[in-house]
Amino acid sequence: MKLVVHVEGRTRLLVPAVSLEADPPPTSPVFFNPAASLNRDVSVCVTAAADGSTFCDSMTGVGARGLRVAKEVSRMERVALVDFNSEALKLARRAARLNGVVRKCEFAKSETSSYLYSRYGRDRRFDFVDVDPFGTPVGQLQGAISATTDEGVLSVTATDTAVLCGVYPKVARRRYGATPLNNHFGHETAVRLLAGTVARAAASADTGVRPVVAHSTRHYVRVFFKIEVGARKADASLSSIGHLTWCPSCGESTAHASQTISCERCGKKARNAGPLWVGPLTETEVLRRARREAEGRDLPKACETITALLGVDDFPPWSFDIDETCSRLGIATVPESEIYRSLKEVGHAAMRTPFEKTGLKTDAEYPEVVKIVSALGRAARG
């Protein structure tokens, strides 16, 4: 296996040369995905912005995330790098020496859940636990929750985005116990479905969770949670579990405590997603601190990702797609800037959704959005 030194952030990693050449990178003999660098950039920034000095990279591979935290977050005292692949751990250990952080790292050859459950106990838990599997994280959630300290941070990634975005709804119901939506705000629904799954798993252990950062790409959805131990905290989390309803006929979206069959506006059959998280996905102060970390570390893409989330929770848990709305009206696509300007002129706030390629979030109801877009379309035709 030919190895190369690959620099990511301020950290030198030992990775197979083929991992930098093949797309997708091979999973054997060890796995490293260079395309996930943004995921790890954001992770470093959020970790640096929060309190705590112990970190568990529970699916470490060649050690990219754990080594970056050990190297780039100065207050970190102990980082556990866990993997079942002996060859991957050997590379992680060699890279730890290369970066001068081997003394603060511990290496464990173990299956993820077994290791995480072994860390249950007041003095054995971690301030940060990261779960980043290939596919669904559901099988690791209970162990990860038990291994995270009270007021610690649990970060969870899901890479089965086609499942979470509604391409395979039966698989989503089996894995996540929830129904997704395959529509223009499917990625936000995917984020909320993952958050809801984590909240329900935590509640079964009398633990609450509070999302502080959430982001997504075409390949993954990822949520950082503050862990809050206690039955009352669990009950508070469950109060943010609900359902989203979307009407394919008229485009109306609503949130409910339970499923609804018919659209409230047109009365036709609606589509439901859930149970999922309908509460806030971010905390502004955490985002601001993480953004400052990204700026100070010269990580422009991470800074852009974090900045795009500011203000997202001022709006309902869905978005409107401009192309979809214009198509529904039978008009040419109206410029995004004109829609924002028109909404603000009549007293509404709006922003680009950070979860989809296109789309806007607004506090205006959908009929008013349709009215504005229609008027702009007529004006453009003259």
Language-model region placement:
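SAM-dependent transferase fold signal centered on methyltransferase-like domains
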Residues: 1-382
